[in-house]
């Protein structure tokens, strides 16, 4: 089967030949899944890893299981190049491709998420923003169509502060410390500002925020500021080429990578391998663990790449972002499966998938049954909490691999929840929304 690929604003669509690697073609009676992806441009390497894992998992469900309760998966991937306007164009293209819609959209871009977030309720298409997007959308009473599933940016930011505190001997020892937020100058990079300012006020550390213009491959002036400021820690809120450049430039100015912590979009092999020896010692948050030691990864290797020969790229298997793509696809599949429990074993609509997402309960037993084991923490979504976890763990790049640097942990959950509810309430007032649970 072939997964169709298109390019926004292209004269002609690019379609994969049936049976070609990484592709699943649309067929009548299937569950159509639309992907707003990117595999080219300055963020293409990151996107290729994530979406490679995403499509490989969908292939596994078709090849191993015969679909979801007998309903095969089909779909189309539209290339956005991580561009907001192209992301909107891809969204508009994909939403009409099937009688049941695109199932759920993973924008994989905070900017694209903001650009389409007000469209989702009208179009009845759920948005799954796994570890990115608009943080206050975690409050499903105000944002019933948006699911920042598992953990959000404020979970990441407060988790990083807590991790730094453990390295300094406790929260009390953060008082008077200097922390720099080196951030991608975009909606993505600005998302943690408010919560880090609140943490700085609460814990008494100095916070200096330094933007890096897109795409981030020039950082001399930023690191000159950092060298002059002499911070105790640098938080790297990077994406794409920005993260490797930050590590290499830190080495040039003599800033220790053991005092740098990336967020989970600045902590993959794409970043560290590109940085070379400059990455050694660098810490990063993570939404998921990398590695091939999970039954689900081994099934994909054996069935999708081995037997069916429809895998995306064997070199990416088990990397942090590829595993994250596998996990993201699993959330979509499990939401469809949950929706089928209520609405029947047939292709389900976006409205029905929204109910499935809001009622997801993936406990440790279910994770093990699916072959994910400890790759992810348990997740239980509700109307009030469209995240369902709030946990993060940390890893450190040592030599040529990521090694665990913590167990699953939470940052300042009380602060995060209060800020989510306050921000969501302001949005509700602005948009004249009455906060309530939709049900199904």
Give the residues covered by each predicted segment.
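Short, low-complexity disordered leader/linker segments with a strong preference
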Residues: 1-32, 426-440
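Immediate post-signal peptide segment of exported/extracytoplasmic ligand-binding proteins
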Residues: 23-35, 66-72, 168-178
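Beta-alpha junction/loop-to-helix N-cap segments that form part of ligand/metal-binding clefts
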Residues: 30-32, 45-52, 59, 64-140, ...
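Venus flytrap/periplasmic-binding-protein-like
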Residues: 80, 127-129, 133-138, 215, ...
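Extracellular/periplasmic Venus flytrap/periplasmic-binding protein
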Residues: 86, 96, 135-136, 144-253, ...
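Periplasmic-binding protein-like
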Residues: 95-110, 126-130, 178-182, 209, ...
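Extracellular/periplasmic periplasmic-binding protein-like sensory domains
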Residues: 250-329, 422, 434-436
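Segments of small-molecule ligand-sensing domains
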Residues: 311-322, 333-407
């Amino acid at each position: 089967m072939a997964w169709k690929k298109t390019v926004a604003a292209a004269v002609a669509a690019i379609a994969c030949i049936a049976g070609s690697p990484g592709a699943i073609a649309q067929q009548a009676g299937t569950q159509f899944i639309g992907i707003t992806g990117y595999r080219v441009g300055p963020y293409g390497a990151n996107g290729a890893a994530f979406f490679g894992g995403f499509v490989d998992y969908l292939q596994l469900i078709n090849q191993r299981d015969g679909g979801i309760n007998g309903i095969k998966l089909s779909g189309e991937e539209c290339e956005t190049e991580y561009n907001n306007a192209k992301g909107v164009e891809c969204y508009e293209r994909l939403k009409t491709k099937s009688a049941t819609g695109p199932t759920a959209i993973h924008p994989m871009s905070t900017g694209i998420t903001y650009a389409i977030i007000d469209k989702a309720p009208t179009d009845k298409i759920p948005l799954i923003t796994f570890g990115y997007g608009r943080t206050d959308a975690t409050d499903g009473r105000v944002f019933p169509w948006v699911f920042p599933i598992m953990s959000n940016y404020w979970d990441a930011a407060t988790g990083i502060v807590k991790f730094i505190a453990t390295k300094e001997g406790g929260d009390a020892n953060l008082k008077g410390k200097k922390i720099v937020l080196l951030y991608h100058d975009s909606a993505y990079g600005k998302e943690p500002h408010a919560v880090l300012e609140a943490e700085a006020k609460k814990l008494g550390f100095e916070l200096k925020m330094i933007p890096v213009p897109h795409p981030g491959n020039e950082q001399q002036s930023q690191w000159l500021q950092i060298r002059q400021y002499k911070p105790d820690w640098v938080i790297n809120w990077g994406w794409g080429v920005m993260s490797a450049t930050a590590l290499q430039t830190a080495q040039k100015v003599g800033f220790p990578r053991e005092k740098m912590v990336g967020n989970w979009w600045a902590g993959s092999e794409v970043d560290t391998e590109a940085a070379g020896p400059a990455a050694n010692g660098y810490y990063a948050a993570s939404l998921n663990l990398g590695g091939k030691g999970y039954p689900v990864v081994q099934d994909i290797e054996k069935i999708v790449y081995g037997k069916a020969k429809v895998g995306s790229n064997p070199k990416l298997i088990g990397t942090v972002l590829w595993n994250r793509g596998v996990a993201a696809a699993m959330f979509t599949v499990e939401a469809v499966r949950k929706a089928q429990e209520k609405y029947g074993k047939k292709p389900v609509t976006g409205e029905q998938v929204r109910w499935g997402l809001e009622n997801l309960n993936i406990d440790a037993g279910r994770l093990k049954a699916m072959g994910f084991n400890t790759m992810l923490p348990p997740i239980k979504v509700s109307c009030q909490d469209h995240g369902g976890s709030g946990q993060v763990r940390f890893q450190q790049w040592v030599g040529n691999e990521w090694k665990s640097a913590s167990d699953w942990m939470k940052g300042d959950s009380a602060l995060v929840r209060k800020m989510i509810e306050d921000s969501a309430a302001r949005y509700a007032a602005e948009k004249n929304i009455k906060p309530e649970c939709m049900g199904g």
